[in-house]
Regions:
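ER/secretory pathway lumenal C-terminal domains and tails of membrane proteins involved
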Residues: 1-391
Length: 391
């Protein structure tokens, strides 16, 4: 059942969510109509009267109560509903979450005793209050997901318990520190995410050159971060494939213990570039991180082809910016800086992986671009052609 958080402040919408719709049971909300109708609990203040954490269910019952002691008189205009602590938790029944598939058996040792969050700000909207109530009332019965494209504030602290499963994060009782490098959240179960991306998801006609992918579609694809999701899966597969390190004399050797996962990582990146091709959807910064994976997996040609495609794209950006008047060029300084940074990264990656001749080829292209000379190269991109190469 999809819940639109922008509408969840409306009593009429909460009514709809609580009702059964076709084969979908109503969303588990404990508040009754008289407790959430228009003008009632439109916002709830947060007052740190106690430091100790309380169960989210207890706090929801406190907020829903009309007893005088559950109201705050600190504000003008009368009594206001409040939450007496920032620290909330949902208890976890370990046996239950294993039996109903919330957590896979191989991850059983990672299950926490309770999911803990800390509320931010000074108040909650009715929509935010309903989100907390849904999670508390559900009590691990049904899967609960948050969309990938939502802002972090909408996650209300549950992002520490996310599991990325494609276009959404599932709330699971496993704590994971966020990966700030990718501005992304959650852990990855490679078996689940691989099956979704490679077998279950239908990608439509994005890759059909006859289909026009306009700026709106570009933005949608960027917001959903599909390429980043493919990347994160491939990186996790590579990490799981190379888990054994041993010392031989003075040399540290990282051994590949699972070649199957290496092949899966390659297929994941290939699938990403097949379904969301460069000739349809513009390159983004995430694609730079595909290249080291191709190199590490022994796919030198694919690594070089992708690096060359990205080098051409960034060189074209520099060539365009260089053709502008000084005033217009100044407005694009950040784009110019990003392209220069990307090109330097491509050269460095190639050299680190022993592709010195190829690195020099990129360097020569950059120098030709910056000096205004035409770029000449006989290189043919067999794997990842770009629209700019065909024009």
């Amino acid at each position: 059942r999809i819940v639109n958080l922008s509408l969840l402040a409306g009593d009429w919408y909460i009514d709809q969510m609580k009702r059964k719709a076709y084969e979908s049971d109503g969303v588990p909300i404990s508040f009754t109509k008289d407790q959430y109708h228009a003008g009632v609990r439109d916002f709830v203040t947060i007052e740190e009267r106690v430091q100790q954490p309380f169960s989210m269910k207890e706090v929801m019952e406190f907020v829903a109560s009309d007893r005088p002691e559950t109201k705050s008189n600190r504000y003008q205009g009368g009594a206001v509903d409040f939450i007496p602590t920032r620290n909330l938790y949902i208890p976890v029944d370990k046996e239950k979450v294993l039996v109903n598939g919330t957590v896979q058996p191989e991850d059983s040792a990672l299950i926490v005793d309770r999911v803990e969050i800390q509320l931010k700000g000074n108040s909650l909207t009715k929509s935010q209050l309903m989100v907390l109530d849904i999670l508390a009332t559900n009590n691990w019965e049904r899967p609960i997901y948050f969309g990938v494209g939502m802002g972090q504030d909408s996650y209300m602290g549950f992002d520490k318990y996310f599991q990325l499963e494609g276009a959404a994060y599932r709330v699971v009782p496993i704590k994971t520190e966020n990966n700030a490098a990718y501005y992304d959240f959650g852990r990855i179960n490679t078996e689940i995410l691989y099956d979704n991306l490679m077998n279950k998801f239908v990608w439509g006609n994005i890759k059909d050159p006859k289909v026009n992918i306009d700026h709106f579609h570009d933005n949608t694809i960027a917001v959903m971060k599909y390429r980043n999701t493919f990347l994160r899966l491939a990186e996790q597969l590579m990490q799981e494939a190379a888990t054994e390190t041993r010392v031989m004399g003075d040399t540290i050797i990282n051994e590949i213990t699972d070649s199957t996962k290496i092949q899966e990582a390659i297929r994941v990146l290939d699938k990403s570039l097949e379904e969301i091709p460069l000739y349809q959807v513009p390159a983004d910064f995430f694609l730079l991180n595909y290249i080291p994976i191709y190199y590490a997996a022994g796919e030198q040609e694919k690594g070089n082809d992708l690096a060359w495609a990205l080098a051409l794209d960034n060189a074209q950006t520099l060539r365009y910016i260089g053709s502008l008047s000084p005033n217009r060029r100044k407005a694009l300084e950040n784009d110019e800086r990003r392209s220069m940074q990307a090109l330097q990264m491509l050269v460095d990656m190639a050299r680190r992986n022993g592709e010195n001749a190829f690195a020099q080829e990129i360097q020569d292209m950059v120098e030709s671009t910056l000096s205004g000379r035409p770029v000449t190269s006989k290189r043919v991109n067999k794997n990842f052609p770009m629209a700019s190469q065909e024009k």
